[in-house]
Design a protein with these regions (language model features):
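Flavin (primarily FAD) cofactor-binding/catalytic cores of flavoenzymes
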Residues: 1-77, 83-258
Length: 258
């Protein structure tokens, strides 16, 4: 396919029926090898499609397994490097991630702008692969597809792969598309009116860390406009999974219902 043929690029695989237009037997390039890719690949293989996936390091999500509890965390982490060093020295990395999870938002907020950027540049891909894991049953199914040749994993540039191989469709499996979200009418109009601004590092929208209230172009709280979930990734980082969203919704409900 022509990589510029946008009609054959699925930008958001979570849109209703997004994968329905990919015909049976198609050869599909997935960009990204995280949990979104896993779901997309299993769906497409069920339609007899061949799937090739690529990412910079070719890392697949780790697999869930029971793990013991850790007694606690250090009193503070001064940098992303501190976090990664601590994780490396734990006897059970799954238990370490579980211990970090309730404190991740606080730790993220304690990093300055430079520290957050260092994390995103150097540690994010490893964090995502270990933090967002596959269920064992899903992992076995994916491993079976890889063994049969229905799914292939490639490390490197998606552009090079697309130019050197023939694909019928491309599916973006890189997670939430912040640029697309901010360009949709509701958020775009708020940003144009100065009632919202992009979040730190271009992720989601900027919000008050405690209340979720949107911040205006000048940094002041927007009147009665709040966000939860993925729109708060720049502010909180850990804001995409059900436990965190549930906690945010609970706090917001307590704030709004008086």
């Amino acid at each position: 396919m022509n990589v510029l043929d946008r009609s054959r690029v699925v930008r958001d695989p979570w849109e209703p029926d997004a994968l329905e237009r990919i015909p049976r037997g198609a050869h599909v390039l997935c960009i990204g090898t995280g949990l979104t890719f896993v779901d997309v690949a299993i769906t497409l293989v069920a339609k007899s499609c061949r799937v090739t996936a690529t990412s910079r390091h070719g890392l697949l999500p780790a697999i869930h397994a029971p793990s013991p509890s850790l007694p606690g965390l250090p009193t503070s982490f001064t940098s992303p490097l501190d976090v990664m060093r601590w994780l490396r020295h734990q006897p059970d990395w799954r238990a370490a991630f579980a211990a970090l999870r309730p404190e991740t938002q606080r730790i993220w907020r304690s990093f300055d702008d430079v520290g957050q950027r260092q994390f995103l540049r150097h540690a994010r891909r490893y964090w995502d692969a270990h933090r967002h894991r596959m269920a064992p049953e899903v992992a076995r199914l994916l491993e079976d597809h890889i063994a049969r040749g229905s799914v292939r994993i490639r490390r490197g540039s998606a552009q090079d792969l697309a130019e050197s191989h023939e694909f019928d469709f491309v599916v973006l499996c890189t997670g939430p598309d912040d640029s697309a979200a901010l360009s949709r009418p509701p958020l775009a109009s708020l940003i144009t009116a100065g009632q919202a601004r992009p979040g730190p590092h271009g992720m989601g929208v900027d919000t008050d860390a405690d209340t979720g209230q949107l911040l205006t172009a000048t940094g002041a709280p927007a009147s009665r406009i709040y966000a939860i979930g993925t729109l708060r990734r720049g502010t909180l980082w850990e804001s995409t999974a059900i436990p965190e969203i549930r906690s945010e919704a609970r706090r917001l409900a307590a704030l709004l219902v008086v």
